């Protein structure tokens, strides 16, 4: 494996569920990675807690590689519930989500970020459907708002096949819009082979999330997230494919399950190092 991959590792801040910037710094230091993808929503919602983050990170030699924002009202109870409530699809939460997104764009610019990622929600596939036009309009508004500030956006992957996402990205046709590729999500959502999906979406690749999963045995149900290196993602093929593609972006370790996330991310770092 290309040794530069280890130098481009980062940690997703929300995986660590930090109470404040000092807690985040302490956990990053215990993991042994000083690069982070930062969740923007806590900073926007609790500025009195997070307003010293830039200064503290500078003192601690921690680099923010990118940002992430979420959307209100998401229900991950079942595959069907997240299809209805995920991302910017629901009309009931759109106005408030749009206000929050605009504020997050300002915040991202203040943090000198060049990339922000998000879950758009399940994308419609029929171009003549009203839902397609609605989603196209909303995504273009979001993309252009960040683009006006010199910021790229990355779709989180997994909620549709790579071919469907490629078609939507082609239709959107925005140079600052691409993909934050997560191989485990392709497994969790049962949307095809992660490596083939990576090849399909390669031209739009902005960043990768690194986590692992086991595919469901019951179609329509979730797969199961597991510690990186213990699931079904073929990591040697994954990193080999990135090397073939000459990918130079960041690789952010994410852990969204379990009660030992700091330890699990440390294991992930060690596993990735063992592949070199």
Where are the language model's segments positioned?
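Acidic-and-aromatic substrate-binding clefts and catalytic sites of carbohydrate-active enzymes
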Residues: 13-21, 39-51, 73-75, 123-128, ...
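Acidic/histidine-rich catalytic cores of soluble enzymes
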Residues: 35-36, 67, 136-232, 239
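Alpha-helix N-cap and loop-to-helix initiation/capping positions
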Residues: 45-48, 52, 84-99, 127-138, ...
